[in-house]
Structures are given as C-alpha cells and as structure tokens.
C-alpha cells in the first residue's frame, strides 16, 4: 500500500497499528462462520472445518467451505510465491523509457514535476520518489506494493490477461481492481492469487469481467491531496496470494512475475525512469539500482498486509 510515500509519517504509525490489528491471526472464537474478516480469499483451518473470507451483503465475513472445494492446498491457497505465474505484461500504466527531450516516460511526466515538501524532513523524504519500490522501509514498515505517480487523468491498464475477481472500495474512497491470472477461477470474494491495481477511480470493469493486458481499468487516484495539488495522481500495483498454512494475506515482489517476453523491456523502462528522476531531481540518493534485485524489489521477502516480511 506504499504507506510510507503517500501520507505524512505523523499518521503512518497509527495506520500501521490499525493494519496489524486488522489482519492479526484470528485463532480464537472470533474466527467462526458469520464473523467479520478482513481480506477476501483468505482461507483458514479451524477445528475440523475450513473457513474462507468472502464478501456477503457488502461485508467481509467468514463462511464454511464445503469439503469438495477447500482441502489442503487446492484452489484456496498456494504453497509459496513460486506458484505465482510470470504473466505481467506492463506496470499498470502505459510506460516507455524516459525521454529527456519530452520529459516523459510514456504517460508518466518526469521533468518539471516537483514533489511535495513538509516541515518534517522525514515526510518530505517519504514523498520524494516518483516510483515507490516493493520492500521500501519507512519507520520500520515494509511496503508490500509498488507505487507510480502520474498526471491526474492518466489511464490505469490491466497488467495481465485474466478475470476481475474482486473490486473493493477502499478507505481512501477509491478502488482496487484485483485480477486473477488466466486459467484461475474466482472464488467468492477473491482468488488464491490476485494482481492488484490499487487506488484507482472511475473503474470501467466489474467482478467477473475477463480483461486483457493493456485494457483500461480506470484512472489514477486523486486521493493523495499533497500530490493532487501538484496535478498528480497515483496507482499502486502488487500481487497478493493466499499462502497455505497461514491465515494472513501475503504479497510478493511484483517484478519477479514479469512475462518472459516482456521482462527485458519492462526492466529497461523502470531503470530509465529511476535514472531519469535522479537526473531531473539531481539527487543520486533517490534510488540505488544496486540495491534492487530485480529492479523494483528491495527485498525478496514475502510481506504481509501488516507490513512485516518473512522469507
């Protein structure tokens, strides 16, 4: 959710506490059919039954899963991030290598963009990057998604071919379009693997729609008031998966799942954007390419929605 780069850090600690509480393991009486849950698609084993978090009547609740559909590691979960397919064909925006002559990288504006500044240097630093990286650490909090800053009105496009399995409205009054890869069926309220296009407005798809890579899903969100004042919006992209044996949501680094035919061009694009931003801002400390492996990943750890990482 790239919390470290989208809100002043004075609010960050409180949000982290709320997130941690929201997804803490529920191995108690609260985990029962009909009780509230927090992440669609997560399945837990309680007693002799499996419970799955699904959306019913506009709310997320635990429901009992029939024995035909959820035993062990079948459609409800995967063993590890190694089971996530390499299917990503773009970064969620129509990006190109940075062109110093135009100051743009496809739909992203690089030259002439000035990030917000604050009296607190830590807040200023948190807003300093035009692309947020998976595994970035802000006040000890790991970021589980990537973030891209782009002009207001910029189209968000599907990263892959697949099915829209979830489309929740978020706390920020915008949306997340969550797409299961081609060949994976939706479960009620989600899927074991979901590629996230998070914080977009004016969604153009609905749950159940088949989408193609490059298809417009919506528009970059304007919810970040400090960037909005600069004429800029944002989108976060990530990959969620339900890990067998765990009842918390997990994320892996998106850049590990690029389609082989697109990997070279996509990594070149991201490298050129980072280098372009360094040049425009005249600040070599904004990105360390050597610290990213692959580009876009500052860690290979899986990260939970409580912003903690585990290998």
Where on the chain are the PLM-derived regions?
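Zn2+-dependent peptidoglycan hydrolase active-site motif and core
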Residues: 158-204, 226-238
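Acidic, glycine-anchored pre-beta loop/turn
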Residues: 203-211
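Short peripheral tails and domain-boundary helices/loops at the edges of structured domains
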Residues: 236-285, 292
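Surface-exposed, glycine-biased beta-strand/turn segments
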Residues: 77-177, 184-186, 212-213, 222, ...
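Extracellular disulfide-bonded cysteine-rich modules/repeats
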Residues: 47-55
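Secretory targeting and sorting signals
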Residues: 1-29
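Disulfide-braced loops of extracellular cysteine-rich modules
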Residues: 36-40, 45-47
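N-terminal low-complexity, Pro/Thr-rich disordered segments
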Residues: 27-37, 56-57, 62-86
């Amino acid at each position: 959710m790239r919390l470290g780069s989208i809100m002043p850090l004075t609010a960050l600690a409180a949000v982290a506490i709320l997130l941690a509480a929201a997804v803490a393991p529920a191995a108690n009486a609260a985990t029962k059919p009909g009780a509230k849950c927090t992440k669609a698609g997560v399945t837990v084993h309680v007693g002799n039954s499996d419970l799955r978090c699904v959306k019913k009547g506009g709310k997320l609740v635990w429901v009992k899963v029939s024995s035909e559909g959820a035993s062990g590691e079948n459609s409800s979960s995967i063993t590890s991030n190694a089971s996530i397919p390499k299917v990503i064909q773009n970064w969620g925006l129509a990006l190109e290598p940075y062109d110093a002559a135009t100051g743009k990288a496809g739909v992203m504006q690089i030259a002439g963009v000035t990030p917000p500044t604050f009296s607190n240097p830590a807040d200023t630093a948190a807003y300093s990057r035009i692309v947020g990286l998976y595994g970035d650490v802000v006040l000890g909090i790991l970021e589980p998604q990537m973030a891209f800053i782009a002009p207001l009105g910029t189209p968000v496009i599907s990263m892959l071919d697949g099915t829209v399995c979830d489309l929740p409205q978020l706390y920020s009054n915008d949306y997340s379009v969550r797409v299961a890869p081609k060949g994976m069926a939706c479960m009620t309220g989600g899927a074991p693997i979901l590629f996230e296009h998070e914080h977009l407005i004016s969604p153009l798809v609905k749950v159940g729609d088949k989408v193609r890579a490059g298809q417009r899903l919506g528009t970059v969100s304007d919810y970040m008031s400090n960037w909005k004042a600069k004429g800029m919006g944002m989108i976060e992209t990530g990959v969620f998966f339900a890990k067998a044996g765990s009842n918390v949501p997990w994320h892996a680094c998106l850049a590990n799942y690029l389609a082989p035919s697109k990997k070279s061009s996509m990594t070149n694009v991201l490298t050129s954007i980072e280098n372009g931003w360094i040049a425009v801002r005249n600040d070599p400390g904004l990105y360390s390419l050597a610290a990213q492996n692959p580009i876009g990943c500052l860690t290979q750890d899986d990260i939970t929605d409580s912003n903690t990482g585990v290998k």
